[in-house]
Curated annotation (Swiss-Prot):
It holds the Pfam family Phage_integrase. It comes from Rickettsia akari (strain Hartford). The active site is at 159, 182, 250, 253, 276, 285 (o-(3'-phospho-dna)-tyrosine intermediate). This is Tyrosine recombinase XerC. GO terms for cellular component: cytoplasm. The keyword Lipid biosynthesis does not apply. Belongs to the 'phage' integrase family. XerC subfamily. One of its GO terms (biological process) is chromosome segregation. It comes from the Bacteria.
Amino acid sequence: MLDILIQELIDKWQKYLVLQRNYSNYTVISYNNDLKNFLEFMNYYNSELVTINHIKNADIRLIRSWLAKRNYDNFTTSSIARGLSAVKNFYRFLEKTTQLNSHIIFSIKSPKKTKLLPKALSEDDVVVSLEHIEEYGNVKWVELRNKSLLVLIYASGLRISEALSITKLHLQNLEFIRIIGKGSKERIIPWLPIAKNLITQYLEILPYKLGDNEPIFRGKRGKKLQPQVFNRELIKLKHFYGLPQHLTAHSFRHSFASHLLERGAELRSIQELLGHKSLSTTQNYTKTSIKRLEAVYTTAYPIKK
């Protein structure tokens, strides 16, 4: 149970993350869970209901004790780092909106995360997936939705959250998609005809009317399709066809990058297409013109025709 004032601040913080920072729903939910875990620990630590004063006066011993508790509870290094990042984000929000001054929490460094290489699928596994994803849908429009979404992710290297935010307005430009990604960073992705044609076919039989600004990928009841729903479709596909365990919507984004690289595409062009600040932690990406990005597709992409 939370103090009413704190709950109001959390609600405002979540709206800020979505509306001003353009965070995905998944990130906001994860951050919210991490913050509540921190506040529950603070409640236990102080043996009383947490108030805004407890938050303002939290000392380094409390924060380090919370991190140690998460480590004891077998949270991964990545989860511990994300949790600290979430709490720091909330404190930064309090700095902007209340009288909270610079806090000791900002002096605490995140634990170093073990870097795992992204797992891509083989081109054969991608082909099997694209050929058979339509088998999981029960009705024609859902089958076509699944295929057009999967092709879009693999053809464009989009994050699942970005792909699920595509609207009719994105379809009006015949040459490229303008994507607002993490941290409100904009990037340009050339349209591949195969992706756009499938989406057009899907929209022609979609049983729901949509405004120009509404996401086009819908669930069976007409609401915006959620990532976990689509990944459940991929789990069925994976099990039936014996595809790799790491097959998820995100693995097609990794495959997009890996297959371009294997076919000779320039690293910095891939970097730009993915919307990364860098493909390594030390390398900043350079801007590439739309024509240059289109040239990458024309010469290197395996499903360009």
